[in-house]
Amino acid sequence: MSLGLLCCGAFSLLWAGPVNAGVTQTPKFRVLKTGQSMTLLCAQDMNHEYMYWYRQDPGMGLRLIHYSVGEGTTAKGEVPDGYNVSRLKKQNFLLGLESAAPSQTSVYFCASSY
């Protein structure tokens, strides 16, 4: 694998219970070349106001990228550079990478809360 590849894994949050996940991420896994763009979808079916996008790099804890406090609102987190977000519907929070860079190789997580 060359350094020119960017691997972005989007993993669903763990949940307790059977079929209904509550929060889901799409796609679950993605590999990009440097400079490519992509969008991750975080969807929740619990009518939550707050939604969050995090990244976790090797050897580090979760770091907040962006968050939303309701439909149509977004705010920057700890590491917002290189990302854009939108929340046009209460149940969906999109995270976009316009031009992927090797520094964005990470595991991405989304979450929601009241």
From Swiss-Prot:
UniProt cross-references to InterPro entries, sorted A to Z: Ig-like_dom, Ig-like_dom_sf, Ig-like_fold, Ig_V-set, TCR_beta_variable
SUPFAM superfamilies hit by this protein: Immunoglobulin
All residue ranges annotated as the Ig-like domain in the record: 22-114
One GO cellular component term noted in the UniProt record for this chain: T cell receptor complex
GO BP annotations, alphabetical order: adaptive immune response; cell surface receptor signaling pathway
Entries under Pfam families matching the protein: V-set
Glycosylated sites: 84
Keywords recorded for this protein, A-Z: Adaptive immunity, Cell membrane, Disulfide bond, Glycoprotein, Immunity, Immunoglobulin domain, Membrane, Receptor, Signal, T cell receptor
Cross-referenced PROSITE patterns: IG_LIKE
Protein's job: V region of the variable domain of T cell receptor (TR) beta chain that participates in the antigen recognition. Alpha-beta T cell receptors are antigen specific receptors which are essential to the immune response and are present on the cell surface of T lymphocytes. Recognize peptide-major histocompatibility (MH) (pMH) complexes that are displayed by antigen presenting cells (APC), a prerequisite for efficient T cell adaptive immunity against pathogens.
Protein name in the entry: T cell receptor beta variable 6-2
Organism for this UniProt entry: Homo sapiens
